[in-house]
Regions:
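Short beta-strand element of the alpha/beta-hydrolase
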Residues: 36-46
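Catalytic active-site module of serine/aspartate enzymes centered on a nucleophile-bearing elbow/loop
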Residues: 291-292, 299-334
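Alpha/beta-hydrolase-fold enzymes
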Residues: 144, 150-231
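Short alpha-helix in the alpha/beta-hydrolase fold that links the catalytic acid
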Residues: 256-263, 272, 283-296
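Gly/Pro-rich cap/lid or specificity-loop segments adjacent to the active site
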Residues: 19, 47-132, 139, 143-165, ...
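Acidic catalytic loop of the alpha/beta-hydrolase fold
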Residues: 248-252, 280-285
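Short beta-strand/loop motif that positions the catalytic acidic residue
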Residues: 270, 276-278
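A short loop-to-beta-strand scaffold at the N-terminal edge of the catalytic core in hydrolase folds
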Residues: 19-31
Length: 334
């Protein structure tokens, strides 16, 4: 096993349901300083794990393990932390409860404090749903987080993104093999439909117009869809992915016991020096939404990733985009 497990025990989630044996999977890079002031928190993305986050970690990069203690934490629902696929009945499969980003970040704060004795975070950063968690960290623990960056993500899910995710969800649950979530095998047709739907959202019009699939080794658009997207989620559990979609849809920075629905107060509470990095062509998290968020934050800057790679501008696919993000993180850590 290439990761560790934080045994959180009985955890009552924001929805009111208790997980009797909650587990949080995490991976660390580097060493914790004796002063415990070199901690970077890097939460996971949708349908991803800590193993997908090495693109921003390495010698000479902002997240240099020789300087920082980098903690990559897997969300509940990721398949490694407590998830529908690994939780015992009666909370397994489709009966797994709704998890919010408030739940995830409260568990992550416990992990740092109880396992490592850490109370101050030098930087929290993340891509996509990882960025949602970065916002939650900075808002819920404003006196503990010194710097924050969200790339191709938001603190609150927009209605348009919510609707897109509904379409993705329907692609899975309308497969006859779904069987209301009590499937005997994965609903492969539904997962294929999910991949095809994602293909039109993850990358931009400009990307497709430029036939960028040819740079990925595909002779035609159909070859690309079949070769890259049709089976992209076959290695993931469907209930896990639906749990993460529910978490994504429920993401609202103000909807928690700290701010009681006052979203503007939740953004205004962020003290951390912040750089928000939307992708110019990201359909999930448009620049305009991040502009509205930054306007509510007292110490935030907006830097747009000028890329045709859509949502993937934040995910390490293109060296230039990754270098742009890395420079922002270096500026925050300077």
């Amino acid at each position: 096993m290439d990761h560790e497990i934080f045994e959180a025990g009985r955890v009552t989630l924001q929805c009111g349901i208790t997980l009797p044996d909650c587990k949080v999977a995490f991976k660390t890079h580097g060493k914790l300083a004796p002063s415990k002031d070199n901690v970077v928190v890097f939460p996971s993305r949708y349908a991803g794990t800590h193993a997908d986050q090495t693109y921003l970690i390495g010698p000479g990069m902002a997240l240099d393990p020789e300087k920082y203690f980098i903690v990559c934490i897997n969300m509940l629902g990721s398949g490694l932390s407590s998830s529908p696929s690994n939780t015992a009945r009666p909370l397994s499969g489709p009966d797994f409860p709704l998890v919010t980003q408030y739940d995830n970040v409260c568990l992550q704060e416990r992990l740092l404090r109880e396992v490592f004795g850490v109370e101050t975070v030098r930087l929290v950063c993340g891509w996509s749903m990882g960025g949602q968690q970065a916002f939650q960290w900075a808002s819920l623990f404003p006196d503990s987080v010194e710097a924050m960056s969200c790339f191709c993500g938001q603190g609150t899910t927009a209605p348009h993104t919510h609707v897109f995710l509904e379409g993705v969800k329907q692609g899975i649950i309308l497969d006859p093999a779904w069987e209301n979530g009590y499937y005997k095998e994965q609903p492969w047709r539904g997962l294929t439909a999910k991949g095809r739907t994602w293909a039109g959202w993850a990358l931009s019009r400009e990307w497709y117009r430029a036939k960028m699939w040819e740079t990925q080794g595909f002779a035609s658009l159909e070859d690309y869809l079949k070769g890259n997207w049709d089976g992209i989620y076959f290695g993931r559990d469907s209930n896990d992915m639906l749990s993460l979609i529910a978490t994504w849809q429920a993401c609202d920075l103000g909807n928690n016991p700290v701010y009681n629905g006052d979203r503007e107060a939740a953004y205004a509470a962020i003290k951390a020096k912040s750089i928000i990095l939307p992708g110019r062509t990201d359909f999930y998290f448009p620049v305009e939404d991040n502009e509205a968020e930054v306007a509510l934050m007292p110490n935030a800057e907006l830097r747009v990733i000028e890329s045709i790679w859509g949502h993937y501008a934040g995910g390490g696919r293109v060296a230039e985009d990754t270098a742009f993000i890395d420079q922002a993180l270096k500026d925050l850590l300077a």
